[in-house]
């Protein structure tokens, strides 16, 4: 259920139309039964606004007595991921408190030992401790510029493990992943054949 929107004159002015209904591009949905809220942004947010948006999310979470925030951050792979290797899609994570890290361990999610996290997830991690809110950031491997539905499916499954009751249409995501992988393979094959023809 849509319960709120985040608006700013600094955002790109965009209206997202779904089933003939216009929506603000940055929205908050909530499920009262599951005590779960989801922030959705369908615009790219300027880096200069990360701090403002991150703190807006944290303040909203505090005002609504949320005790856990789950965010995600991309880990870009320069080379294509081997879809046949499940380890390629393993997700690592970081928690801002001992309680958050124990929650990850209980869900058998690997902890990031060393590294950096940027953007809004970094603001959530750095600013949340003073508010007493647990934050978990899931790190997902992607290939830059290519929609990766397998990674999305893995992310959705991981969130479902952390928040029982939250679900997503995983089979549909995997079906889309398979379709896109076949298209990419076909394009690469055609490109290789064209290169061979060029050399006679």
Regions found by a protein language model. Name each.
Residues 58-69, 129-134, 162-166:
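Secondary-structure boundary elements
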């Amino acid at each position: 259920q849509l319960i709120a929107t985040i608006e700013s004159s600094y955002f790109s002015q965009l209206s997202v139309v779904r089933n003939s209904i216009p929506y603000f591009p940055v929205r908050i949905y909530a499920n009262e039964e599951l005590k779960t809220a989801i922030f959705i942004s369908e615009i790219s947010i300027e880096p200069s606004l990360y701090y403002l948006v991150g703190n807006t999310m944290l303040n909203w979470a505090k005002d609504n007595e949320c005790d856990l925030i789950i965010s995600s951050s991309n880990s870009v792979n320069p080379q294509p991921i081997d879809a046949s290797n499940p380890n390629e899609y393993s997700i690592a994570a970081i928690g801002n408190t001992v309680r958050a890290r124990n929650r990850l361990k209980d869900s058998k999610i690997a902890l990031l030992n060393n590294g950096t996290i940027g953007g809004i997830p970094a603001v959530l991690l750095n600013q949340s401790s003073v508010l007493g809110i647990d934050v978990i950031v899931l790190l997902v491997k992607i290939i830059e510029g290519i929609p990766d539905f397998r990674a999305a499916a893995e992310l959705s499954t991981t969130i479902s493990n952390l928040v029982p009751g939250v679900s997503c249409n995983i089979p549909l995501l995997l079906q889309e992943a398979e379709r896109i992988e076949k298209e990419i393979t076909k394009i690469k094959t055609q490109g290789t054949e064209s290169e061979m023809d060029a050399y006679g």
